[in-house]
Every structure is written in structure tokens, then in C-alpha cells.
């Protein structure tokens, strides 16, 4: 796939107050030269200072780096806006907020090198890399990331995805994957190593870069926990994707910024029901406690009138799809055009599709529902996704 990589000129500065900056800069330049050998890759160094651009161009051309382009930030912005429908082709590497906003406006991937000056939004929402080697390896994964661990077209306009296998006890393929999934359950991995949410975020962003599936998503949300709270790590994951995709929430949100609310706690299904009961219970447990946030009603009504009511909903796990079933039916009742359900982990069970007729307002609990029909949808599994996650684990948890 053709890629256009826009690098802030800070990446070539040798006077940054960073230990071994000359070695770091030389390593970065050589890795970018290696990436540039791909005939479908174009590398641009960007600045608003034309004199700095001319000096850098002269210096690096004299050293034999003929594949690099040096362009003004206005020129870069114009080029991106002209090809805004081709956002999968763009990668931005910078620590500047101005570059971050250009990436967001074009819904492009934004990578933040830790060794150059970082501004607040860039560092908060970008993919942070610690070394030139991490940067090089991560960019290479963008060329190869083609796999979701599990995918199923539930019905026209509704897709369910899972990023990784959640069955670590007997089914994982590598030690790294086992480590990832154990931490996926206990949330204990912190400190210097990348949190597993970060690894899955990078995996998701790499996949999102290579598909148009998410381009027209207007609303992002997540499944509330059984106790009505929002898992802070999953919320951060969802929020980061929403910001990167340049999607906004309503201004007045007394009920919070998640599109789904759990109004009363519910029993955890795996602690309260037998396996066969969970497989066949459908959305009933969810309907009793789950509703759409009324703060989003005006926005939802507007999107529906414009045929743009397209949503992406995140959850930690998918077993039988009971929660996603509930959400699918709630938003079908509101006239949704497109829904993408993304679970971070899958237990490799079929999706138990159940279609309901819903009466009453779905903006509070108390609506009524009746089952119309049931069917089973199977997932396509791709074990290549296991190795892609495994590779990212290695990239971001190694000593360079």
C-alpha cells in the first residue's frame, strides 16, 4: 500500500538537549532511508521555516539521502486535504500539536518520538515510541497488519471484530501472547512495560490505518461494567480512538460522555448462570439495565436524518455476543445505518444473533421487548493476528 510519511523537522535537529542525540538522529535517518527503499513510500520533512528546510535539504542531499523531500507545513496540509479520502496512506511523525491536528483532521495515524520535544495533545493521543528502532519496527508493522483475530458480518451494516484470543490457559501460541492475555485479565501490568491496552491500541490503529471500515463512524462508545462504572482503561482506549478520528460529543452531557448507560447494577453473567444458560439467554439481562444516553438524543436524531448514524462500540470480551446483541437492537430501534462492535478479546464462541422488537423509549430503562427470531453467526479466525500482537509486544517491551 502506498504510504506518505510526514516527519517534523525536529527529528533532524542535532542540538536537542537529549543524551546521544547525534547517534539517535543518525539511527533515525538510516531507518527512514531503509523505509524509503519501498517504492510505494514517500518521506517528507516538514517545517514552517523555509530556511531550516533549505539547510536540511542541502545537508542531507550532500550526504546521499536523495529520497527525502523537504516541504513547508502549508504545502503538506494542502496535499493532505486534497487527498483526504485517502487517509490510510498518511502517517505523521512529530511531537507538535499543529501536526497532530492535521493528522486528526485527515483521520491519519500520528506517531510521537519520545526523544524530540512533545506538546500536550500530541503526546496524550499519539502512539509514543521510545527509540528509532521502535519507530522503524512499528512502521513496518503498518505495512503488514491485515488481520483481525475474529471477524463476522452479523447482518448487512453490522460487523463484529475481536483483536485477540482470550483463552490463555490452553490455547495461546507464544509466551508473549500468554503474558498479554494474563495481563488482559488481571490488569496488573504497569510501569516501564507497555500496558496491554497500549499494545492492543497500537494493533487496532495499525489495522484501522489499512481499512476504510471506520472512516464514516460518527459515534464511539463502550459497554458499561456490570456495576454501572466505566472501565477507565477501556474508556481511555475508546476516547483516544474518538479523538484520533476527529469525532465530537454533545456539549451538554450531564450523564457523561459515553453513549451507553447502565442504570442499575446487574449480576455478572459468568458468576450467575451456567454456560448453557449464558449461551441462550440473549439480551434480556442487558435490556433490564442498559439504555442509550439521553444526552446524545439530538445528535442521534440529526445523524439519522442525514443517514449517518454509524457507530463503533468497544468491550473487553466477547463470548456469545449477548451485550452486543442488546446494543445492536437498541440502535436498530433508533435507525442506525452501520454498527461495528470491537471486543479486545474473544473466547471463540459463535455469535448468538437474536432480533427483538422494542417498544418505548430506549433512552431509559423500562422499554419493552419481544423476541422475533434467533440465528447463529460464525466468526472467521485469522491466527496471523496473534503474531501481529506478539510482534508489537516485542517491539514495545524490549531493551534497545
Which residues make up each language-model segment?
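Conserved Lys-Pro-Asp/Glu-containing loop-to-beta segment of HAD-superfamily phosphomonoesterases
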Residues: 77-98, 310-313
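Active-site-facing substrate-recognition patch
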Residues: 141-219, 227, 267-304
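PRPP/pyrophosphate-binding module of the type I phosphoribosyltransferase fold
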Residues: 15, 272-369
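Substrate-recognition element of Asp-dependent hydrolases with the DxDx(T/V) motif
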Residues: 20-60, 70-73
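Acidic, Mg2+-coordinating phosphoryl-transfer loop and its flanking beta/alpha structural elements
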Residues: 91-129
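Short glycine-rich phosphate-binding loop at a beta-alpha junction
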Residues: 44-46, 91, 215-226
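PRPP-dependent phosphoribosyltransferase catalytic core
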Residues: 132-172, 325-400
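Asp-based phosphoryl-transfer active-site loop
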Residues: 2-22, 313-315
Amino acid at each position: 500500500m502506498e504510504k506518505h510519511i510526514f516527519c517534523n523537522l525536529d527529528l533532524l535537529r542535532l542540538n536537542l538537549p537529549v543524551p546521544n542525540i547525534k547517534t539517535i538522529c543518525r539511527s533515525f535517518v538510516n531507518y527512514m532511508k531503509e523505509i524509503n527503499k519501498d517504492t510505494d513510500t514517500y518521506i517528507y520533512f516538514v517545517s514552517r521555516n523555509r530556511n531550516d528546510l533549505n539547510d536540511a535539504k542541502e545537508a542531507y542531499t550532500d550526504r546521499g539521502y536523495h529520497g527525502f523531500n523537504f516541504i513547508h507545513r502549508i504545502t503538506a496540509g494542502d496535499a493532505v486535504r486534497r487527498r483526504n479520502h485517502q487517509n490510510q496512506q498518511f502517517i505523521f511523525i512529530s511531537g507538535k500539536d499543529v501536526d497532530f491536528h492535521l493528522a486528526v483532521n485527515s483521520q491519519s495515524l500520528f506517531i510521537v518520538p519520545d526523544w524530540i520535544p512533545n506538546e500536550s495533545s500530541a503526546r496524550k493521543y499519539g502512539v509514543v515510541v521510545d527509540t528509532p528502532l521502535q519507530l522503524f519496527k512499528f512502521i513496518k508493522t503498518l505495512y503488514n497488519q491485515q488481520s483481525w483475530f475474529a471477524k463476522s458480518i452479523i447482518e448487512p451494516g453490522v460487523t463484529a471484530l475481536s483483536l485477540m484470543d482470550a483463552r490463555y490457559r490452553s490455547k495461546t501460541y507464544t509466551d508473549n501472547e500468554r503474558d498479554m492475555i494474563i495481563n488482559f485479565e488481571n490488569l496488573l501490568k504497569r510501569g516501564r512495560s507497555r500496558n496491554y491496552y497500549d499494545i492492543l491500541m497500537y494493533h487496532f490503529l495499525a489495522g484501522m490505518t489499512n481499512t476504510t471500515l471506520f472512516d464514516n463512524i460518527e459515534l464511539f462508545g463502550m459497554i458499561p461494567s456490570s456495576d454501572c462504572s466505566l472501565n477507565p482503561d477501556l474508556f481511555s482506549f475508546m476516547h483516544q480512538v474518538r479523538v484520533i478520528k476527529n469525532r465530537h460529543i454533545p456539549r451538554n452531557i450531564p450523564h457523561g460522555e459515553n453513549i451507553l448507560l447502565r442504570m442499575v447494577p446487574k449480576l455478572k453473567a459468568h458468576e450467575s448462570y451456567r454456560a448453557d444458560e449464558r449461551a441462550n439467554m440473549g439480551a434480556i439481562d442487558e435490556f433490564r439495565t442498559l439504555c442509550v444516553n439521553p444526552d446524545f438524543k439530538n445528535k442521534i436524531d440529526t445523524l439519522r436524518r442525514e443517514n449517518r448514524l454509524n457507530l463503533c462500540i468497544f468491550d473487553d470480551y466477547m463470548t456469545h455476543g449477548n451485550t452486543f446483541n442488546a446494543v445492536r437492537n437498541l440502535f436498530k430501534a433508533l435507525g442506525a445505518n452501520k454498527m461495528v462492535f470491537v471486543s479486545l478479546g474473544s473466547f471463540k464462541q459463535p455469535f448468538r444473533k437474536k432480533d427483538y422488537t422494542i417498544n418505548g423509549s430506549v433512552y431509559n430503562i423500562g422499554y419493552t421487548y419481544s423476541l422475533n427470531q434467533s440465528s447463529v453467526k460464525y466468526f472467521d479466525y485469522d491466527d496471523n493476528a496473534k503474531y501481529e500482537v506478539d510482534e508489537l509486544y516485542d517491539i514495545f517491551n524490549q531493551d534497545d
